[in-house]
Design a protein with these regions (language model features):
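Short, flexible helix/strand-to-coil boundary loops that buttress conserved ligand/catalytic motifs
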Residues: 19, 37, 85-86
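A short, surface-exposed loop/turn module that caps and links secondary-structure elements
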Residues: 28-53, 82
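Short aromatic/hydrophobic contact patches that present stacked aromatics
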Residues: 12, 51, 60
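Enriched for short, Lys/Arg-rich terminal
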Residues: 1-5, 24, 54, 62-89
Length: 89
């Protein structure tokens, strides 16, 4: 099954603010989510969210098997991403 990767508007804005070389690496990793989203990332404890590590950055996403899509909810530096993400959800 191939999943569509959808960026939440907040994730898209955060991705645009990241340095281009790092942003390119993140986009490469996001492409891998299309085929096997549960194998690429790591499930966050006590939630239905997943985390993808790309150097010092993390991508927080959710897998919707019913719609065959991966929703990227947040992108940020590892020092702040989980605190910032918890404030949103």
């Amino acid at each position: 099954m191939v999943f569509a990767v959808v960026l939440h508007p907040k994730a898209a804005r955060a991705l645009k603010k990241i340095e281009k070389s790092v942003g390119s690496r993140i986009i490469e990793e996001l492409r891998k989510l299309r085929d096997r989203p549960e194998k690429v990332g790591k499930r966050l404890k006590y939630s239905d969210f997943w985390s993808l590590r790309v150097g010092d950055y993390r991508v927080i996403y959710e897998v919707d098997r019913g719609k065959s899509q991966v929703v990227v909810l947040f992108v940020g530096h590892r020092k702040k991403v989980y605190d910032d993400f918890s404030k949103l959800f």
